[in-house]
Amino acid sequence: MNFNNRQDLINDIREWATNDEISYRNWIHPTILLSAGQDRSYYDRMDEWQEIIPAVAARYFSCMGLPMSVNQVELILTDEDVEDLANGLYDDYEEEFEETRARYHPDRYPDDAERFGIETGE
């Protein structure tokens, strides 16, 4: 694990998080449900994604044999690192978010509802 090459570290955490079932179940999926259900703006969604990054990263470091608390992770990752990770993970799950949002709000997102085969009630 190389803390000197920030982008490699960010890429490793992102790749690992997209394949980790516990991270998905505990942080990623609930964030998708919350932001899709409440139909948050893009910037509010990014704030929500940024909030889960320290927990996801702490799990990553622990699984890599370097147990860390969320507070310790916050000392390692810069605000820019957290933003990069949040944007990357959101991109990885954007289609799932759009489908979930269409299920909650089919009348507001009829194109997405149609794309995912969701009835709009029309």
What spans do the regions from the language model cover?
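Acidic interaction surfaces
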Residues: M1-E122
